[in-house]
């Protein structure tokens, strides 16, 4: 039953009624099938990227090139940040560059983690497993931010001194509110992003 007491048809419905405070306008330039991912994965990446200042003069790393990561790369690059991808292998390097990354760092190759030490202002991890938090923290500059949007199944441990000594920040982020969702829709339309 719906709020009005009438039966609902779920996914078979021809229309819905919602409160206007929870409606976003999808710009005409975004086809509806392209808008759907922006409303979940797009806002999930846009929120920490804008909150932590991705933009011109900033060096940003997106960890993982899956559904979330490929959106993060496009959004970060469109914000004007020097955007990098951290991935296990080079298999997605062409996509990373096509989406706006200047470099892909393959962690399966020797010396990759060491070469990234202290390189990034902001690192956004989309991974749910397979990387140690200490490795991510080591990649950001003093006062840099590691924003985690992936949800690991197991406990994450790290050495607190790796955060404290350089005043680094570890933050979590999960989607965004209605105003921020409208903002990412408008941003994607303005930058012609086809997420």
Can you say where each PLM-predicted feature lies in the sequence?
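Acidic carboxylate diad motif detector
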Residues: 149-150
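Glycine-centered, small-residue-biased loops immediately flanking beta-strands
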Residues: 144-145, 168
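Glycine-rich helix-loop-beta junction characteristic of Rossmann-like nucleotide cofactor-binding loops
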Residues: 49-55, 138
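C-terminal substrate-binding/catalytic core of Rossmann-like NAD(P)-dependent dehydrogenases/reductases
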Residues: 153-195
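A glycine-rich, Thr/Ser-enriched phosphate-binding loop motif common to dinucleotide/cofactor-binding enzymes
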Residues: 7-12, 28-51, 63-71
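Adenosine-nucleotide cofactor-binding segment
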Residues: 56-65, 77-135
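Glycine-rich phosphate/adenylate-binding loop and adjacent beta-alpha elements
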Residues: 1-23
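Helix-to-beta-strand junctions that scaffold the AdoMet/dcAdoMet cofactor pocket
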Residues: 140-142
